[in-house]
Structures are given as structure tokens and as C-alpha cells.
Amino acid sequence: MKLVIAEKPSVAQSLAAVIGASARKDGYLEGNGWRVSWCVGHLAGLADADSYDPKYAKWRYDDLPILPEHWQMVMGKDKKKQFDILKKLMNAPDVTEVVNACDAGREGELIFRSVYELAGCQKPMKRLWISSMEDSAIREGFANLRPGVDYDGLRDAALCRAKADWLVGINATRLFSVLYHRTLNIGRVMSPTLALIVQREAEIDTFKPVPFYTVALELPGLTVSGERMVDKAAAEQLKEACQGAAVTIKKVECKEKSEKPPALYDLTTLQRDANRLLGFTAQQTLDYLQSLYEKKLCTYPRTDSRYLTGDMADSLPVLVNLVANAMPFRKGIAITCDPQTVINDKKVTDHHAVIPTRNLKDADLSALPAGEKAVLELVALRLLYAVAQPHIYSETVVIAACAGREFTAKGKTVKHPGWKALEDAYRAKMKDAEPKKEGAEKALPELTEGQTLSVVAAIVKEGKSSPPLHFTEDTLLSAMETAGKEDMPEDAERKGLGTPATRAGILEKLVSAGFLERKKSRKTVQLLPSHDAVSLITVLPEQLQSPLLTAEWEYRLGEIERGQLAPEEFLDGISTMLKDLVGTYQVIKGTEYLFTLPREVVGKCPRCGGEVAELQKGFFCQNDSCKFAIWKNNKWWAAKKKQPTKAVVSALLNDGRVRVTGLYSEKTGKTYDATVVLEDDGQYANFKLEFDQRKGGSR
């Protein structure tokens, strides 16, 4: 009997259906000499700090850095049932071999190995490595199972990544939280990513627009423009000199140009396009793509390659044809297929580019959720683009002279639309299609060198230099992908912040931690840093916010994966960095109150006349010698199922009383309205009720 372990139940069911394990059991499927079970995400993970020593339950500066000598792996608290099933299956006497069928990548490898090792399994291990959930791909994968030891490097890299995140997250978060008296979540990749955004906002805030002026001359059949000028008076003077004058055509240059189709999608490029064109977050796109993968409609999502392998060349025309037939908006557009434009074995590592599968032919696409359908459409369209003919056009550049200055005009004539015919058809069907740039394909009249033309009109156009744009998920993903790239070896496999598989999760963590805010602006959603984000980057040392260092770590993880670097060497480097950080970092003078939000004054203190401000747990006099306070969890208010709000406290402080509705009566169980009066005895803030006598004080 052979045991197959998938990453989730839906994948296990697909695998079981192909290999004939159709009998349902408790937590697994069985049949045809196979048992197929599943994890539920990460069943096991690295233990928390207090598992190594109970004293670590409390965050103390003196305990840092926390550097485990012997790492502990523990089972997830809510995952015991499925873990016990897997442990029993792995160690069953009749099981002779265990097949790792978790996702073919770092995380999938770690999910399986953690369970395998925690269960104490010693059975021979094989690896199912597939890039598609199509039945044919599954059958081929099981026919070519690989030895599990071939992926020890992948396991080592995944475990080192997890340990590095643990070390930096635990130690840096505790260090800065203790020093600045506020929980500050710091991550190996999160913090440099946040630094990119904060730096961009600083550039925007300090940007000063510079005006410029351009003189444009309207000629018969075309308009020519001069270079930008910073002196308005000089621009006006040039305009006057050109008004009514003759223009001499100095040069007419016509070139035929070709624009190659874009490469196929890797995950990051798809996430960027889905954000720009559809407004999806990176995480939404990944979720939709994962679902499509499990429905056998597209290939493995978490890839960093944009090419296919040579063994796919022969079958590609058939796939392209059926994909084209599934895209209704491409009717009337000739479809071509040049496989060589997308084949490059050297640029495919673990998985090839994301493409649709042949199951698209028989799928009911109208039954798909809207988000999945839109993402699948992008993936299908990109395949058609990538194998299509180049976009060929003729570009004409005219240089004219007037009043001793040169003016230029450009024109474009499409010779063969190529892949852009598909792009135009797709954009035409979109509700919020991006408008084409004015004059982008405007042809120029026939002109000859030496020809003279009269100036019909001369105008001065005024403009201003533009500030950098706020990050969107599209542009931030691009910045993360290229961070530190210029300083990395040319052949480096892993560059930038994070990996295609982790970037979406990093952005979501920054949002949930309150460091990033998504703000709608016209057709885009901007990513803006919070007050705490700016404060955090202000106090973080360079090594924790440097994209270069984190990009170098990603490169080192790639070396571990290839067996070129010992895991201990990588982790020792991080431990040394953390020791230096804890030993040398001091609170930056003047930043002690950076993480304290501005306090809003709600009224005057009835005892000392000082200012009363709202804090997290109540309203307090800001005079250090005065102890006046109205707590938000005050028992008198809690008994009436109310909490003193800012408006209520403000009225009590200013008028001594406030009308409150919906007070709860413990005696009757009903609610009533009354006036609450503040009575301060110098030690405690007390409250009493007054009722409108004309209504009989009815409760």
C-alpha cells in the first residue's frame, strides 16, 4: 500500500480520482493499492518562544535576543484530528511508501516535511511534482515519481526561510515594542517593503513642482513642438518670433518598427495586470488563480517563470486554438502560433509560466465566479498575445526649424496590428477601458526636406513637473520584484523582496497590522502608510529596512535550495545581526512619543481646571498631579449597558449633565431615558440620574 499526502482535500480528491482511490474513509480515500489523505495547510510549525522557556511569555529587553539552539516543531492547536490521522496512516504496517503530493514549491515541501518528521515517519518517500491538475498531467506525474531526497535542498530553504522569519519577527518585534511601549510588528520582508512606501510618500511630500513651457506651432496638416523651456518670457518671445513666419522642414525620417508581444505570465506579472486592469488585490488574484488550478483550468500559480519548456512545443498550437475559440471577443481576428517565442528551457526552474489547460474546451466558463472568470480571461489572452505576430508600424519623425529653434513632430502608421489586435478587442469590451493616448497613431502628411510651410498659429503650452505617484499594488509589486536587483549577480535566481508565492501575503499583513491603508482614488486604489508606519521606519535601523539585505537573503535561500550554501551558515549570519542589533540599538532621541497618537481634549477637569483628554481606556486629566478619570469600563455605566462616549463626557464636563437614551434597568429588563449628572467628590467621579417629572419618571 502506498500513501499519498496532498496539501488540501480538494486536491486529494482530484489525485484519488485519477489513481483509482475511490473508497471514502475517515480522513482519507483508498483503492487500487493507494491511500490518499491531506493536510489542511500548515498542520505543524515552529514553536512559539515560550515553548523554549516559560519566561519568554513576557516580553523583556533583558531576554533578547532569543536564539533557539534546538528548534522545536509543534502541531497546530486546531489541527490535531487530521494530524493524528496522517500519523496513523504514515506508520501503518501495510504502508510501504509515502508520496509527497503537496504543492510543488517551497511551502508545499515544508508543509509535508513538517508532518512527516513530527509523525516520526521513516518510510521511503517519493515526490509528485506537477504543474497542472489535468488528469493527463497527474497520470504522467505518478508515472515519474522522484526520490524525496532530491528535494532536501528545497526543504532546507523552506525551513531556513521560516526560521529566519521567526528570528527577525520575534526579536525585532519584541525589541522595538519594549523600547517604544507599543506593539510594533516587524518582519524580515514586511519592514523593507514598508520602507519603500514610506520613502515614496516622503518624496511626494517634499516634491516641489517646477513649471515649464513649450512652444507649439500649428502648420497645415500637423503640429510641431519645441523643447521644454523654464523661462516663460523666453517662450513668449519665441512664440512671437514664430507667429506668421515660415517653417523649414530640415529632416524627415521614416522607420519601420516592430513591437514584440509580451511574455507569458508569471504570478507577479499577472497580479500586477489584474490590479491595474481589474482592480484586484494581489491576494485576490492568487486566490482566484489557486481555485482555477484546483478546477484544472490553469497551470500551477506560484511560478516565477514566463516561459515554457521545449517538450510543450508540439502540443502548443492545439492549446492556442482551443483557447482562442473560448474567447468570444477575438472573433474576426486571425490567430497565429509561433511556439518558439515562448519556449526557453533555461528560464524555467521549478514551474513553467501560468497558462490555461486543455480543459478549457469543455468547461462552462459562465458558471465560474466573476473574479475567477476575469483572471482566467487574462491568462488565456496572454497566451494568445505571446504566440501572436509582432505589432509592426511605421514611425515618422519630422524636424522643422523656425526662428533659429528646432521643432519636432512624430507620426505613426500601423502596417500589421499583430498581437495588438487582440489587446484592442479586449480593451473595447471593458467598461473602464483605458483611453488611447491622443495622437498615438496619427499619420503625418507627406513632407520633403527643404520644404517650407507657413505657421498658422503659435501657442505657449504651460505645464508642471509631476511628483512621484503613490504606490498601487501593481507598482509596489514591481518595486518589490526589482528591489536590490542592481547589486545582485546577473544569474541570481531569487531577487527582490519576497517571492511570487509570498508577496501577496506580505501586503495583506501590512494592511491588517494597520501599517498600510488602501485608499480609492479615481480608478486606482493607492497604498498609503499610516502614522505608525512612518514612525516605525523613522526608528528602524538600516539593516531592518534595507531592500538590498533582504534581497540578498532571498538569493542565499536560493543557494541553500541548490545545495550551494549550508543552512547553518545562513542562520548564523542572521543571529549575528540580531545580537549586534540588540546590543547596540538605542532609542533615538526625540522619538519617544512618535507612537503616541495626538490626544483630543474633550473638556475641563472639574477638580483642577486642567484639560481632560480621551485615551485608550478612558478620559483622564492631563495634569500629572490630578487623578480625575472617567473610565470607559466604569461599573455604573456598565450596569446600564452603556459606555461613556466622547460626546457624553464632553457634555458632562462642560454642563455637568447630559441626556442619555436607552439606559438599561436591571430591575425591569427594559430601557429608559434619563439625565445623567456628574458628581465629583474629589476622589471619584460619581453619577446620578434625574428624570423628567412631567413624564412621571416612567421606566
Q: Language-model features: where?
A:
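Conserved short loop/turn motifs at secondary-structure junctions
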Residues: 1-3, 101-104, 181-183, 254-263, ...
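Secretory-pathway/luminal and periplasmic proteins that interact with or process carbohydrate-rich
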Residues: 295-301
